[in-house]
A protein has these predicted regions:
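A long amphipathic alpha-helix within ATP-dependent nucleotide-binding catalytic cores
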Residues: 1-48, 99, 103-106
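C-terminal active-site "lid" helix and adjoining low-complexity regulatory extension at the edge
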Residues: 14, 48, 52-111
Length: 111
């Protein structure tokens, strides 16, 4: 292996509908527990033997690269059959809507 290469110690797969629902709920619960806002990534690992899932971290500063060798987002988007550009657009739209709410609230308070 080269200086900046590593072996993936995990695998990405398209979950069943039931598992996808459980992952989404666990992610929402973890994000709400830390009062997350905006874009973030919830790192979860699942014990293959038991099926139990564990939240490793809520990452609010995760990378945004389509290249699966640099960040996991590329694999997630690919497995979700989404376009990377659509995901970025949704992140930007959410950030703008959030900022607009703060601006409107500040104008109301300063009247």
């Amino acid at each position: 292996m080269g200086e900046h290469e590593y072996e993936n110690l995990w695998e990405y797969f398209k979950p069943s509908a039931q598992l996808e629902h459980a992952i989404k709920q666990l992610s929402i619960d973890a994000y709400c527990a830390v009062r997350g806002t905006g874009y973030g990534r919830i790192d979860i690992r699942m014990d293959k033997a038991t099926g139990k899932m564990y939240v490793l971290e809520v990452n609010s500063q995760c990378g945004l690269s389509e290249d699966e060798n640099h960040t996991s987002i590329g694999a997630m988007v690919r497995l979700g059959n989404e376009k990377f550009s659509d995901m970025l657009g949704a992140i930007i739209e959410n950030a703008l809507q959030t900022k607009l709410k703060y601006i409107k609230a500040a104008k109301f308070i300063n009247k």
